Amino acid sequence: MLKKAISKLVEGKNLSESEIIEALDCIMEGKATPAQIGSFITALRIKGETIEEITGCAKVMRAKADKICPNVDYYIDTCGTGGDGTNTFNISTATAFVAAAGGVYVAKHGNRSVSSKSGSADVLEALGVNIDLDPVQVKECIEKVGIGFIYAPVFHKSMKHAAGPRKELGIRTIFNILGPLTNPSNAKGQVLGVFNPNLTELMANVLLNLGIERAMVIHGMDGMDEITTTTSTKVSEVRNNEVITYELFPENYGIALASPEDLTGGNAEENAQIIRRIFNGEKGPKRDIVVLNSAAALYVGKVVSSIEEGIGLAEEVIDSGKALQKLDEFVEFTNSFISYNEMSG
């Protein structure tokens, strides 16, 4: 089946959803050779991935992942594609804590760094979080603390078959955009940052196909996979079963324009310190960008009805110390599992 799919892609023809499901299933089951995997993902990239193809791949990855079903009504993910090359600190990770402290349940999906100095898993470890939890423990985190971290390699074990060819190719492939689409908790709300402005509508339509209720797919026009504060941001919003695309300007919300240098991060330890300083009340451009992105998460999380209202709540959550409290609570709760895990071997 994979040979047939490769020859079709090489001719520049699109695959149907069922064809790509069959092809990716073959890869995830370990039935494809490294050469076939490399050819398949390269040919797909050259042709350009369609909404149907990305939807099909996301369905396969979701089906093969270890699932969690938190016993809460509605929860969101704040996970970007990464790979934007802007070397900012971990904005979406900071945002997850502000959203959780503001009353949104968060199932944060993430991994170690791919392109930056610090991925969400790296900075969470530097903050003191125990990320090595099984699905039952992550579910408990979401239900009891309001936030859980879904560490991708633990939940997506069948991805290991594609890891070698991906690494050896060293180019962006469909797997770079599948990560944020394959949250094993099947979150119904999402703030999803992408590295390319052409991806916002594409990804929003895929999320719609996957049954999302509300989402903002965002690309800062400075290249950031976040809502930026240096210029405008392209947003494709999923709401009421449709996709609406617009530009978001930070100055319209009373946020001062920053320079890219104002938002630079460092390694995991440095980024952890930046997040703690913001949560301890430090003002400035780094706090501003966390507030703006948190406003989007609170809006997608349905606890506020507009970005303006979200900004007010995000500021209140940080200023009152609730965001810091939520971070400390999460650190403590995730570490309470360590002794149990060690005892159970």
Swiss-Prot record:
Anthranilate 1 binds at residues 80, 111. Mg(2+) 2 binds at residues 225-226. Anthranilate 2 binds at residue 166. It catalyses: N-(5-phospho-beta-D-ribosyl)anthranilate + diphosphate = 5-phospho-alpha-D-ribose 1-diphosphate + anthranilate. Its cofactor is Mg(2+). GO terms for biological process: L-tryptophan biosynthetic process. Binds 2 magnesium ions per monomer. Catalyzes the transfer of the phosphoribosyl group of 5-phosphorylribose-1-pyrophosphate (PRPP) to anthranilate to yield N-(5'-phosphoribosyl)-anthranilate (PRA). This is Anthranilate phosphoribosyltransferase. It comes from Acetivibrio thermocellus (strain ATCC 27405 / DSM 1237 / JCM 9322 / NBRC 103400 / NCIMB 10682 / NRRL B-4536 / VPI 7372) (Clostridium thermocellum).
